[in-house]
Amino acid sequence: MSDNPGAGTGALPDLLYSDSERALSDSLTSLLADRGGADKTLARTESSQTYDDKLWQAVGADLGCAGLLIAERDGGAGASYREAAAAAEVLGSFVAPVPFLGSAVVATAALLSVASSDPAVGSSGTPLTPAKAAADLLRRMADGGVTTALAVPFATAPGSAFAASVRVAGSRPGDATTGVARLRGMVTGVADALPASVLLVPADGVPHGLYLVDMAAEGVAKAPVVSLDMTRQLCDLSFDDAPGTLIASGSAAEQALDAALLAGAGILAAEQIGLAQRCLDMTVAYVKERRQFARPVGSFQGLKHRLADLWVSVTQARAVSRYAAACLASGSPDTKVAVALAKAYCSEVAVNAAQECVQMHGGIGFTWEHPAHLYLKRAKADSIGFGTADAHRAALASLVNLPAP
């Protein structure tokens, strides 16, 4: 699906949208605008159901965003991280309450890493192996029918140590013949797990690895937690002798986890750009129509300078974010550097854009009825997601051999 001329080569990638990326962005923008946009999301925050299942059906199944990264032979779109970033920009601009990041990006990246470890996965008639189990789950996820979440705290940064909060503990009669292990422990602050039907759980013990767990299985419990970002509610997951199926162990599990976290950080940066651009656009539109002293407030030089500075920072951040997505798409050796740079820079730009949006809207920007606070809360939560700006700057310094003084 990707038609970027620089993808997969040594050439510098094109940081502008390709035709297919533009088409995806336009289609998704039109769909979300027709569904009511941020105003409908604001109304939804007052209900007990924060995630919009019908919207996810339209975005994930009808537009194919659930299977963007999944191969066409498995029912997906066969697209790349460039298309995923284009979709994330739009979803961020609408603060859409759908599990695209958690399921279509993070969990999918982990499963793709596992499935790629077995060259026989695509063959018909092969026995059920851990890698084939991962490939089978990808096929079920491709049309949005199954939503999967990686059971790690939202704040987990790429390169973090393998999670040890869940352990393999004991067994029950018959487990050995079914390949089931029993998991115990708790994971706090997990994003996009509330609407998930399947969990990918990193667990320590014997064997140390990545396990598939059915959310409806005995011994699995989820508890929503009060989240700053009401459009992406976090939850705590607990496992009490919950049955899990091993799909990757040892270094393969660690590689899958790191691939997922790296993809999550890179695509989250794209979401932050969509959010920042929407905050800028809303603010510019407002200061053009809001009048004080018989003139639009946007004509005042102080506001002009602040908006000009914001436009420059958003434009710079977009270039950094799209370079990171292009590196993820091509498997560039520069990927870790690009993602660390993008997440560090885009986090601060998004928060600044949301703060300026609230402040330049004046009194109305501080009210519950205006959606500006949704953008500020999403920006602040995203700035922690998959590593803070400081964590990514520290990682970047290590990657380029530039230690702190």
Residue ranges and their predicted role:
Residues 36-197, 202-221:
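Glycine-rich flavin
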